[in-house]
Amino acid sequence: MLAVSAVLPDTLPDHPPLILIHSSANSAAVWRCWQQALAEQRWPSYDIDLRGHGQSGPRDLSHTSMQDYAADITVLVTQCRQPPVLIGWSMGGLVALMVAATGAAGACVGLAPSTPAQQFNTSVVLRTGEFGGEEYGITSHDPDEQPAMPDLDREERRAALASLGRESRLARDERQRGIIIEALPCPLLIVTGTRDRAWPRERYNHLGFTADYLSVEGASHWGLVLQRRALSSMIPEVLRWIVQHT
């Protein structure tokens, strides 16, 4: 079973549902600030724990692929009454793009998404196994020792650490080899943070298809999901874009 947390307005919404897709080695818990803000704006949202993550329960992820994660999102998408907007962060952004490429989404928003490829990097060897947050620079559970989260306050860092979990080595290697997406049949917004050293705006210069871009001043990679100061201006901008494009 897949765990999904829905936050719905108490009246019939005028907006399409938003599906929130977390990143590698963490869980849907990273979306707590987003869901609160979306509820205040009366947008229905669904955050999903991908298989083996968070509330979806532990399982062996050694052989889990990116296509498996896309299949998890498709299960939720097919239960929506209208085409949803997919919002994915980092690895989740690439999963969102994979599902959107099938024509299932009304629009797609990538928060510093892992980039799709135009061809395979055949030098990458696909391995099985699991890893954790240490591969992303998180080697301590002390909120005061998190160089990967320079813009988060202590409470936000605690939330980030609480979201951590295991991840599929195979899925990561597949991303390194390349997930090919040739075209996207829906509007795309890519959001980047000016303090994100891993996924700056420049990494999307050769995306291969049309996208709009939003730069968030002072936000790191983690800041795009948990830095409340940045989210207070960023989320309204994202919602305005969605209204204009759906």
What are these regions (language model features)?
Residues 25-33, 45:
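Serine-hydrolase catalytic-loop signature spanning alpha/beta hydrolases and amidase-signature enzymes
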Residues 53-84:
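Active-site loop/oxyanion-hole signature of alpha/beta-hydrolase fold enzymes
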Residues 219-233:
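Catalytic histidine-centered segment of alpha/beta-hydrolase-like enzymes
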Residues 101-136, 171-177:
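Flexible "cap/lid" loop of the alpha/beta hydrolase fold
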Residues 38-58:
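Conserved alpha/beta-hydrolase
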Residues 184, 190-192:
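Short beta-strand/loop motif that positions the catalytic acidic residue
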Residues 192, 197-203:
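Conserved alpha/beta-hydrolase "acid-adjacent" motif
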Residues 23-26, 194-195:
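Active-site glycine-rich loops that stabilize anionic/oxyanionic intermediates
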